[in-house]
Amino acid sequence: MRQAGRYLKEYQVIRKKQKNFIDFCLNYKAASKVTLQPIKRFDLDAAIIFSDILIIPYGLGQKVNFKHNEGPILGSYNLKEFKKNNKQKFLSKVRNVYKAIQYTRKKLDKKKSLIGFAGSPWTLLVYILNKKSPKKNFNLNKIIQNKKEVDSLLKIIEKFIYIHIEQQIKSGADTIQLFDSWAGLLNKKNLNKYCYQPNKRIVKKIKQKYPNIPIICFPKGLHKNIVQFCNIVKPDCLSIDSKADVNLINKKISSKTIIQGGLDPKFLLGNKKACEKKALFYLRKFKHRPYIFNLGHGVDKNTKPTAVQHLVKVVRKFQS
């Protein structure tokens, strides 16, 4: 999950100087600086590069803006224009993401991992066609009604996700995470085509060329279908949201699969004892298998840094 953000004063100082969010992500020195802020504050075990999953639609030529209290707003998209993209053209538009990784790797403790990431095909498809967050008034049938166009678009998205991931690895990312943030919007009939198979193809392609790079998948909202996702996609690590069934995971998912996350970020906004209790719940539930403690989503903007610090202490104490 993104570690840097509005809950940190030092982040706000840098954010105010940036023209817009995409420019911020493409200012490699600023992106690197905010990537390292949570590491300096909390001494976390890994850093995740400060960027955004919508860098890919931006790199393909679609306008991407972020409106206050609304989230991302994307411009119109043209399949013919998307098809004109090649690797060189795409990389030239987003090259500063890779510069940020190189810059961060030099400054980051060698013992700490640097995580690169991308959105999964389905999630990027949703943003490209819906042109905004699908939280409200999302119509699945409308999005996928033009099967031929959707299939063509998915192929393009997949191709450039791989290009983007490979370039991050070449630049110094030693772990990759795929965010399928809107996997939960799919019904059972469409899961295989739009979620399982595209993620499987990307994971397989990365592992074939970079077998030592761990891959984390975050299929948010799958819940009952999370076992099938793991069986088909075969990620090294499964990242879970706060509604995931931990008993189902322990029972049905191989103990070789690392589990990450789970804690609802809202616990960081409330009582320390309640947060501590819930954190220990996950740590105890997954103590007999490889587990990376993390949140089930990004840090809320209203979180106090002291709450994060306390949570880190709770986890460290449990580990020892």
Residues covered by each model-derived region:
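N-terminal basic, low-complexity leaders that serve as flexible interaction/assembly modules and, when applicable
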Residues: M1-G59, F66, R201, R284, ...
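Active-site loop segments of alpha/beta catalytic cores
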Residues: M1-R2, Y7, K89, K93-S320
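Short capping/connector residues at structural and topological boundaries
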Residues: Q12-K16, N65, N69-G71, L268, ...
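Intrinsic-disorder/low-complexity, polar/charged segments
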Residues: N20, N27, N78-E81, K135-K136, ...
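Glycine-rich, proline-tolerant flexible connector loops at the mouths of alpha/beta enzymes
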Residues: A46-H68, N78, K83-F90, A173-N192, ...
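A short acidic, glycine/proline-enriched capping/turn motif at secondary-structure boundaries
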Residues: I53-I56, G71-P72, P121-T123
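A charged helix-plus-loop insertion that forms the helical arch/lid used to bind
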Residues: V64-L79, P134-L140
